[in-house]
Amino acid sequence: MKKLVTIKSLDHPLAQYLKDDPVRPDIPHDVRVSANSTVFALQDEEKVSAMVCVKYQDQIPSNLDELMDEPKHPTVAVFYTIWSYMAGAGRDMILETRKWIEDNNPEITEFVTYSPKTEMARKFHLKNGASTYRENEDSVNYKY
């Protein structure tokens, strides 16, 4: 049975998995659990199958500085890194996390990514129902 876990502190036992982030390892772990940020883990039985880091913003970020802003009234959930340990878990992670945010944060009305400009990211997001919103200098925003 799959279970979505929210991680809001580096003291959480699942925070240890942040070291495995292959997409944005340079973002400090404490930033990922700050006021406008949440890390989510998808567990299948007791095994972690996927992780995603989400930043809540008041705009769709086009660069890392905009992603790191701390707005007072966020309306956009930005999925900025996702990785999985099991085939197919990334898709489940995105869908489960979006549902959780919709149910728990009604002020969040847009769901986008801040993705690297890679073919793997493009295929992943388009295959899972996103559309290309904007291509930036060093990233792409996909909209769910």
Label every model-predicted segment.
Residues M1-P74, W83, P106-V112, D138-Y144:
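Non-catalytic substrate-recognition and accessory regions of acyl/acetyltransferase enzymes
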Residues H29, G129-N136:
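Short secondary-structure junctions
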Residues D65-G129:
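Acyl-donor binding region in acyl/amide transferases
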Residues K3-I7, L95, T132:
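Hydrophobic transmembrane signal anchors and adjacent membrane-proximal interface regions, especially
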